[in-house]
UniProtKB/Swiss-Prot annotation:
GO terms for biological process: translation. GO terms for cellular component: ribonucleoprotein complex; ribosome. Keywords: Ribonucleoprotein, Ribosomal protein. Gene3D superfamilies: Ribosomal protein L28/L24. Belongs to the bacterial ribosomal protein bL28 family. It comes from Mycoplasma mobile (strain ATCC 43663 / 163K / NCTC 11711). InterPro entries: Bacterial_rp_bL28, Ribosomal_bL28, Ribosomal_bL28/bL31-like_sf, Ribosomal_bL28_bact-type, Ribosomal_bL28_sf. This is Large ribosomal subunit protein bL28. The gene is rpmB. GO terms for molecular function: structural constituent of ribosome.
Amino acid sequence: MARRDDLTNKGPMSGNKRSHALNATKRKFNLNLQKILVTLENGSKVKIKVSAKTAKTLKKQGFVA
């Protein structure tokens, strides 16, 4: 199961974990993925996996059931 937004196709980003001594080790920044129920224009409902930011936008536009 890929950690990717179904609508915007955004995925995890890479970066560095920094200790107090500023040693750098690689890490991954994952998305805050949520499963939401979206109502399509024809009235059918679909469950999709989107980031929290996308879910907030869909809710504001009135697509979330």
